[in-house]
Structure formats: structure tokens, C-alpha cells
Amino acid sequence: MLEYILWTALYVLLIVIPLILVVAYYTYAERKVIGYMQDRIGPNRVGSFGLLQPIFDALKLFLKEIIVPTNSNRYLFFIAPILAFAPAYAAWAVIPFSKGVVLSDMNLGLLYILAMTSFSVYGIVIAGWASNSKYSLFGALRAGAQVVSYELAMGFAIVGVVIAAGSMGITGIIESQAGGLWHWYFIPLFPLFVVYFIAGIAETNRAPFDVVEGESEIIAGHHIEYTGSRFALFFLAEYANMILISILTSIMFLGGWCSPFEATPLEAVFNFVPGVVWLFAKTGIFMFMFLWVRATFPRYRYDQIMRLGWKIFIPLTFVWVVVVACMVRFGVGPWW
């Protein structure tokens, strides 16, 4: 029993520590990419080309004093960042990086991930309420409404993938797309593919859906009163969720670790490329799109965000799920 616990703890560390490093350098890439798009240089002072900037940013955050606001609920104030951080990293337990390379290959992997990503909003709402600040509270209320609105659209998109694949296990979904580019679900499920990724941007409170922490309205929203390591936990959770949405989009709609050249004359040429490389390459595309969208689009008004979620995304995904179910039931389309 003890040996099992130790091995499990080791596997968890092998996922969490590299993920934190990826998050750190994702912030560096974000500043460089957005700087280039805005005709700036970006960080270039700490280390060669600014490569040590994320390390020193982390040191700065974790060495800062933790300030607790007057009349705040101290217990909830301290527990909220953990409630935001823990589910964001726990969701990675069921992500397969290649065939057999997964911490826990659950039959209900997608349901588990949907549950974990939904839990993060509790940390945001509790942080807003416990901080004893009107700006924090407004940000928390916005976060709650926004997550509920876009979680439904994401849920319907996931249901469409599950119906098409005939499995809720993530490995099963990837294997159902084997056979090359034309077997990937982004073609027959294109509306669900687009809605899922846009809803993922909204779910992570990123621009142009970042009204939860709109600087011009409520300054920093739910984490305005947080400093030091507590703020860093919210920061780590946000970027881990962005990477999670990117890798899930790759898995559900772009075949995961499957090569795009399967069942083609080029299959033998690219056969040496490991599946994990294909997965990371596809994930990198969506990680870049998060940055591109942030640098390009202005922030929506809150009523526009709600209208987009309830009047466009939810009806669209619901109708497409019905269409996919009928196609699968009557043997029409690319699944037969």
C-alpha cells in the first residue's frame, strides 16, 4: 500500500512540476508574442533574451508579503486560491500524452475533466466574497454567471464528441480518430469544434471575455486583494486551464497523438515521429491562438458575453448534438 502511494505521488510530481514550468514559460511566450504583435520587444533583460524572466517573476511573487484585508474571512481568504489551483492541476491526471502514457486511464475521463474545470469557479467566487471588497465581489459574481453560461455550451460540445466516438474515455476518443486527417472530428463536428474552443477562452476568463477582471471597470476583479504566493496560485491555475483547454481541443477534434499522415503515402516518412510530438504540436497551435486572440480583440461588454453564450452557443451546440445523434443512429456520415 505504501509503495503504491509513493509511486502515485511520484507520477503526480512528474506531471505537476513540468506543467508549472510550462506555465512559467508560457507567460514568457505570451509577453514576447504580444510584444511582437504590438511592435514592442518584450522581456529581454533578465538572462539571454529574457529567458530567466519567469524564474525571477516567480521568486518575486513568492517572496512578497501576504496581506490579509481588514474584516475579511481569513479562513476562506486563504482556502480560495487552493480551490482554484488544485482542480486545475488534478484534471491532468486523466490526460494521455501518448498511448499508455497516462496517470489514470478512466472510462469517464471527459466527465471527470468537466467536473474538475467546474470546481475552479468555487475558488473564484469564495475569493471574491471573502476579500471584503466590492470589486472582488463583482468579479466573483461575473465569474459565476460566465462559467455557468459557457459550461453548458462546452458540455454540449463534449456530448457531440462522445456520441461520435462512442466512448467517454479520452484514449477511446483518440483511437476512434485513427486513420489520418480525414478521420478527425474537426471536420464533421466543425461547429462544436469552434464553439468549444471559444467557450474555453470564456471559461478561463481570457480576453476578450475577461470582464471578471476588467481593469477599466473592477481593476483586478476577484484577486485584487491577493498578494504574493496566494496571487501566484490564481495565476498558475489560469494558465494551466488555458493549456488544458488547448490539449483537450487537440484530443477531441484533432486526433490527439495520431499522425495526420496515417493511411497516406507519407505515413512511412513520418512514422519515426512519436505520438507525443504530434499532440504537443497541435496543442501549441491552440496555445498560440489564446495569445493571438488576446492581442487582437477588444473586450466584450458583459451583456454581449451573456447573449453570445445563451442565445447563440447553447442553441447551436444543442441542435448540432441532435444532428450528430441522428447521423450516428441511422448510419449516416463519416462514422460508418
UniProtKB/Swiss-Prot annotation:
Location of this chain's protein in the cell: Cell inner membrane
What is the predominant subcellular site recorded for this chain? membrane
Q: What EC number(s) has UniProt assigned to this enzyme?
A: 7.1.1.-
Keyword terms: Cell inner membrane, Cell membrane, Membrane, NAD, Quinone, Translocase, Transmembrane, Transmembrane helix, Ubiquinone
Show the stretches that span the lipid bilayer: 4-24, 75-95, 108-128, 154-174, 181-201, 233-253, 272-292, 308-328
Q: List the disulfide bonds.
A: none
Q: Has the keyword Cell inner membrane been applied to this entry? A: yes
Q: How does it sit in the membrane?
A: Multi-pass membrane protein
A Pfam entry, by short name: NADHdh
What's a GO biological-process term for it? Answer: aerobic respiration
Record's GO cellular component, any one? plasma membrane
Does Lyase count among this protein's keywords? no
Instruction: From the UniProt record, list the reaction(s) this protein catalyses.
Output: a quinone + NADH + 5 H(+)(in) = a quinol + NAD(+) + 4 H(+)(out)
Q: Name the Gene Ontology molecular function terms of this record.
A: NADH dehydrogenase activity; oxidoreductase activity, acting on NAD(P)H, quinone or similar compound as acceptor; quinone binding
EC class of this enzyme? translocase
Instruction: Provide the function of this protein.
Output: NDH-1 shuttles electrons from NADH, via FMN and iron-sulfur (Fe-S) centers, to quinones in the respiratory chain. The immediate electron acceptor for the enzyme in this species is believed to be ubiquinone. Couples the redox reaction to proton translocation (for every two electrons transferred, four hydrogen ions are translocated across the cytoplasmic membrane), and thus conserves the redox energy in a proton gradient. This subunit may bind ubiquinone.
Entry's HAMAP family?
Answer: NDH1_NuoH (MF_01350)
Q: Which NCBIfam families does the record cross-reference, listed alphabetically?
A: PRK06076.1-2
Concerning its family, UniProt says: Belongs to the complex I subunit 1 family.
How does the annotation summarize its subunit structure?
NDH-1 is composed of 14 different subunits. Subunits NuoA, H, J, K, L, M, N constitute the membrane sector of the complex.
Name-wise, this protein is NADH-quinone oxidoreductase subunit H
